Amino acid sequence: MSAREEWRKRFGCRNPRIVCVGLNYKAHAGESGGELPKAPLLFGKFSNTLVGDGDSIVLPPNIGHVDAEAELAVVIGERGSIFGYTCANDVSARDAQFGDGQWFRGKGFDTFCPVGSRIVPAAELDPSDLRIQQRLNGEALQDSRTSDLIFDVPTLVAYVSQVIALESGDLILTGTPEGVGVFREPKVALQSGDVVEIEIEGIGVLRNEVTA
């Protein structure tokens, strides 16, 4: 059973909606050269991007630079409530993302949203100050804390709820901290055979191998 099928079965949803938030860590907004956003910057991924822990991230042919983003994911439960939290990876094809001037294509390829298998119930975890890391082949690229978020989890859920009625199984990816490959010097891109790990304190590790 695929990760999408397991997700649908678990939450009774047809296709989960994946709402993402851009530039939501202060240091990441700084490394990108942009100003701090005055409101959450929302974009989305379709369910075709969803894969699970241990699944492969597949690099599209002739797409250029691709890198990973460590993210805390909010899992929505019944009636728009917060069911829990898990690890996620907002995989991004930067040449497409920046070349298009918008983010949908660069972040929308198949397998570009790995999500962890462990969901920690909301009542058991305070998301306001958790260590969040990305490791590539064992080397730490991102190492920050969710206390650097510009807009916290309650603010994001309330803001997104003004746009759509959130349903069970929907996901909100809350943004990524500084250290992503495209803004490093020299740049760090994913290559076939790489192993990406996203680890969040109190949740666990999401691990995926990269293939072409």
Language-model-detected regions and their locations in the chain:
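Extended, compositionally biased flexible segments
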Residues: M1-E69
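Non-heme Fe(II) oxygenase catalytic core, chiefly the N-lobe of the double-stranded beta-helix
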Residues: D55-F83, C87-R94
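Structural motif
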Residues: P16-V19, P40-L42, N48-T49, S56, ...
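Short beta-strand-to-turn element immediately C-terminal to the catalytic PLP-Schiff-base lysine
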Residues: V21, E31, G44, D53, ...
